[in-house]
Structures are given as structure tokens and as C-alpha cells.
Regions:
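Sequence context surrounding c-type heme c attachment/ligation sites in exported
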Residues: 1
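Short gly/pro-enriched beta-turn/loop segments at secondary-structure junctions
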Residues: 65-68, 113-114, 139
């Protein structure tokens, strides 16, 4: 199965799927069959996790120089209502897969990593405390990861109020400290030169730099 098919076979949104297929149709002229067989570079080892395979496909596109500007992928399995685990279990496995995939992606790109920015985010958080099934339920705030060229890494950015019940939103969830749009907008402005956020985030007013 070619890169195009792998990335869009499970796309739910019709507009996204159609646009993606049209974009990758152009890659046929660039030899996408050969591109799909391009091995990892710099000794990168992706492993077998689904996210790793998707990031490997994206790395192939970046390395091919076809002009890729934006790519979106996803990783499931985080809805751990039951048996979430701590240092071992579902959560630890997902975090391990995520870390390995990102590390391989960075290694594979080599010098091209300086031209790439990766944003990792979730659509909702988890409760701050365990439920009765040794898992966590849907919450409010969560964490984002930003890495790549132009990012001053090794830092935790944003406010953290702790886990005391009085510090939690509705006494159960982490409170939102940073608007997710601020991080996405800052990244889009830095990487793509976007000057007006309104087409993507109507009504949003950019805040001072979050990432610095």
C-alpha cells in the first residue's frame, strides 16, 4: 500500500480525505511507489507501532523534497477508563510508543529536523485522580509537546497550580493554563509565515509568545 493510501485510508473527514488524495495524486509523477520504499536514514528505528509507521511515511515526504508544508496524523488508545496503570500498563505503553516514534522521526530527518516543527496534543484531558476502575475519566486540561527547529526545548511552559482539590477545575480536573490556539498559532506563524489567525481561529486574539 502506498504512502497516500496509508495516510488517508482511515480519514473520517470527507474534505480532508479528498484534499489529501488530490495532493498525493501529484506524487505519482514523482515516483511515489519508489518513495514508499525509502528506508529510514541515519540509523533511525521506527518499530511497529501504528504511529511510528505514519511518522515514517511523513519523514519520507519531508526527505523527498516534494514541498510538504503540513501533515496531521493521530494515535489512539488513550481513553483509559479501566486499568490505566502507572509505570507499567496501558498509559506507559502508549507513552513509550509515542516517545520511540518521535525519536525515530527526529533521527530519520537529520539536518532537515531544523525545518520541521512537531506539535503533540490531545482533544481532552483526564481526571486528576483515579476512578473506581483503576483508570481515569474524561477531563479538561492536558499537556502539549512542541519540538523541532526553532524550539527552545527542555522546558515546561505555562502555569501549573498543583493537584490540591482547591487548585483543580471543578475539584476534579487540571485547570486550563494556556489556550491551545496560542500554541498552534505561534507554531503556524513561525513555520508557515501565517499572519492572520482569523480564517483558522475565528475570534481568536493572539497572545504574547507562549513558547518564547
Amino acid at each position: 500500500m502506498c504512502i497516500r493510501d496509508r495516510l488517508y485510508a482511515q480519514a473520517v473527514d470527507t474534505a480532508l480525505r479528498t484534499t489529501g488524495l488530490e495532493t498525493f495524486e501529484a506524487l505519482r509523477e514523482a515516483g511515489s511507489a519508489k518513495l514508499a520504499q525509502l528506508p529510514p536514514d541515519h540509523g533511525a528505528e521506527y518499530g511497529k507501532a501504528p504511529l511510528a509507521r505514519r511518522l515514517q511515511d511523513i519523514a519520507r515526504l519531508v526527505r523527498s523534497g516534494v514541498g510538504l508544508q503540513l501533515a496531521v496524523t493521530e494515535m489512539g488508545g488513550w481513553d483509559t477508563h479501566v486499568g490505566e496503570g502507572a509505570e507499567r500498563g496501558q498509559l506507559a505503553q502508549r507513552l513509550g510508543d509515542l516517545g520511540q516514534a518521535l525519536a525515530a522521526f527526529r533521527t530519520d530527518l537529520g539536518e532537515r529536523w531544523g525545518d520541521v516543527r512537531v506539535v503533540v496534543m490531545t482533544e481532552f484531558g483526564r481526571t486528576a485522580r483515579e476512578n473506581g476502575n483503576r483508570g481515569t475519566d474524561h477531563g479538561t486540561a492536558s499537556v502539549m509537546l512542541v519540538l523541532g527547529g526553532g524550539v527552545r526545548g527542555g522546558r515546561v511552559v505555562g502555569g501549573y497550580r498543583g493537584l490540591a482539590r482547591s487548585a483543580l477545575f471543578e475539584e476534579r480536573d487540571l485547570a486550563i493554563g494556556t489556550d491551545v490556539r496560542s500554541v498552534l498559532w505561534e507554531s503556524a506563524a513561525a513555520q508557515l509565515g501565517v499572519e492572520d489567525p482569523s480564517p483558522v481561529f475565528p475570534g481568536f486574539r493572539p497572545t504574547p509568545a507562549v513558547l518564547g
